[in-house]
């Protein structure tokens, strides 16, 4: 299973093509729209979310509500395109139009300057349009398909925010996906402890009033994953490495950890490793889950615990200094549109990205033409594990 996305932030539409989804999976536009709506929610969101109300159109790979094994094409229309039709036109236009909304003042923390240097662009809008977080719309759309497939296999995924800036959100060590959905899933801050919500909203409002932004830490948990996904045999087959790469590929994510994560580097080994236990009923399990469900690049049958670190949104209403690429004169960086935080929305993106990687790994391991064949292969594999 693999996918590609295409489209610019202010272009006519965003597109994703997914190849390798087994035939026979029930799938509707509404399955995807539910996830897209989640991405557009959350406290601290602003301008663009009022303009866009994302709805997907499935144009291939699904017939009469079922996948048919061919590539699935997903399209999301950019409703704001009507205001950018000439500026973002594919055909050549007059110079005076080209100069409209031209960007020569790169924003610190964005791809603007380096992208312009790499591709020899005079107008940095060519970089901004593709590097924008708007692209994550299609990462979520793809993830919605992956989550539908995982649900059929009794694998579930959820996320919650564990830090807003320096504000840590309290949550229990043992936390099920269902508990996350029943708490963080109903919170506009995506937090487990709603008693901290009002203080956090005040904090976010203060950040916004100051013209600043904040980042934080998001945790995604996956349940129902069997032991043995991924491999220790080669570096590029380790599933935790694949997930880490996918998470830091999300706009503004700068780090990832599993289980204890970086805390493991501060503890002695006896306080980090998960002891192995066995019972006739459950087979091999662990007494704890400090390693976040991974050993040797493989899933060990425990819940997957993945955390991603999101930097503050780099577009600031109190802009930092930059250099005009045309005149080389100092200038205050441009403001396109910005929110004080996008952590709740970023959590939805991370959740769907992690789901996609897990679904890809399952489809690769149990290469199946149909969803029924895939289900049977997974059942047979679990049976083999239980007999070890």
Curated annotation (Swiss-Prot):
Gene3D superfamilies given in the database record: Chorismate synthase AroC
Class of this enzyme: lyase
Cofactor: FMNH2
Any one biological process term the GO annotation gives: amino acid biosynthetic process
InterPro entries according to UniProt: Chorismate_synth, Chorismate_synth_AroC_sf, Chorismate_synthase_CS
GO MF: chorismate synthase activity; FMN binding
Residues involved in FMN binding: 130-132, 251-252, 296, 311-315, 337
Enzymatic reactions: 5-O-(1-carboxyvinyl)-3-phosphoshikimate = chorismate + phosphate
Cellular component, GO annotation: cytosol
EC number(s) per entry: 4.2.3.5
Cofactor, how bound (note): Reduced FMN (FMNH(2)).
Purpose: This reaction introduces a second double bond into the aromatic ring system.
Subunit structure, interactors included: Homotetramer.
Protein family: Belongs to the chorismate synthase family.
Protein name: Chorismate synthase
Organism: Lactococcus lactis subsp. cremoris (strain SK11)
């Amino acid at each position: 299973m693999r996918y590609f996305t295409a489209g610019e932030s202010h272009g006519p539409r965003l597109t994703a093509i997914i190849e390798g989804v087994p035939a026979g999976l029930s799938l509707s536009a509404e399955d995807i729209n539910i996830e897209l709506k989640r991405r557009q929610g959350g406290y601290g969101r602003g301008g663009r979310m009022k303009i866009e109300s994302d709805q997907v159109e499935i144009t291939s790979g699904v017939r009469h509500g079922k996948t048919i094994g061919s590539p699935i094409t997903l399209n999301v229309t950019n409703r704001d395109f009507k205001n950018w039709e000439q500026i973002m036109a594919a055909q050549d236009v007059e110079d005076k139009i080209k100069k409209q909304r031209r960007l020569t003042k790169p924003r610190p923390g964005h791809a603007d300057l380096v992208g312009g240097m790499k591709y020899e662009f005079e107008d940095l809008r060519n970089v901004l349009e593709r590097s924008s977080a708007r692209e994550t719309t299609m990462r979520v759309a793809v993830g919605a398909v992956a989550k539908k497939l995982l649900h059929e296999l009794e694998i579930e995924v959820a996320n919650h925010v564990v830090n807003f800036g320096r504000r840590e959100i309290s949550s229990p060590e043992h936390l099920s996906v269902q508990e996350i959905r029943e708490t963080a899933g109903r919170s506009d801050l995506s937090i487990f402890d709603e008693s901290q919500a009002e203080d956090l909203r005040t904090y976010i409002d203060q950040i916004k009033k100051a013209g600043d932004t904040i980042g934080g830490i998001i945790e995604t948990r996956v349940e129902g994953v069997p032991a043995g996904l991924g491999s220790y045999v080669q570096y590029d087959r380790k599933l935790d490495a694949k997930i880490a790469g996918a998470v830091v590929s999300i706009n503004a994510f700068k780090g990832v950890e599993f289980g204890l994560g970086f805390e493991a580097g501060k503890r002695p080994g006896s306080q980090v490793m998960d002891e192995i236990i066995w019972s006739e009923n459950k087979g091999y399990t662990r007494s704890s889950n400090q390693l976040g469900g991974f050993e040797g690049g493989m899933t060990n049958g425990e819940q997957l615990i993945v955390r991603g670190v999101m930097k503050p949104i780099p577009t600031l209403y109190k802009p930092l200094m930059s250099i005009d690429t045309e005149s080389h004169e100092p200038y205050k960086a441009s403001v396109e549109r910005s929110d004080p935080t996008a952590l709740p929305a970023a959590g939805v993106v991370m959740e769907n990205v992690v789901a996609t990687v897990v679904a890809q790994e399952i489809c690769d391991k149990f290469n199946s033409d149909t969803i029924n064949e895939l289900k049977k292969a997974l059942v047979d594999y679990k049976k083999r594990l239980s007999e070890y």
